[in-house]
């Protein structure tokens, strides 16, 4: 990664695991927390923006959680916050632009952003300053 290139979480939004990448229902407005029943699959969608030019080939994004203000830990299939299989999308499918886009100019379509049973969304292609993508995780 080039020195001085930063990636920023622009926005997030919770949704139900009740439909496809484009049709699942939203649980709350952007950047708004929600309450989810225990042992209920849900999805969180996160927009990420790049501050500079970078080759995104094999760049891996991971999801982390923190319980009660403790340190951040990577989400796995067996952690307290864990990945969950979804019958509504394929792991590694591309996401479309569904969140507010004002913080980045170009949406990267080859993004492999839909994630369920494995960690790490792996991008391919190039990103320039102001480019971004969305990743959605089923938990």
Where are these regions (language model features)?
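Polar, enzyme-active/binding microenvironments
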Residues: 1-139
């Amino acid at each position: 990664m080039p020195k001085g290139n930063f990636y920023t979480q622009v926005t997030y939004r919770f949704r139900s695991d009740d439909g496809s990448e484009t049709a699942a229902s939203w649980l709350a407005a952007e950047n708004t927390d929600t309450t989810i029943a225990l042992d209920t699959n849900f999805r969180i969608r996160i927009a990420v923006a790049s501050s500079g030019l970078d080759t995104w080939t094999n760049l891996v994004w991971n999801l982390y959680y923190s319980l009660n203000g403790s340190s951040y830990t990577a989400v796995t299939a067996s952690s307290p916050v864990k990945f969950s299989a979804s019958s509504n999308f394929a792991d590694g499918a591309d996401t479309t632009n569904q969140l507010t886009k004002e913080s980045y100019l170009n949406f990267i379509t080859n993004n492999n952003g839909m994630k369920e049973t494995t960690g790490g969304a792996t991008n391919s292609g190039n990103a320039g300053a102001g480019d971004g993508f969305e990743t959605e995780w089923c938990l």
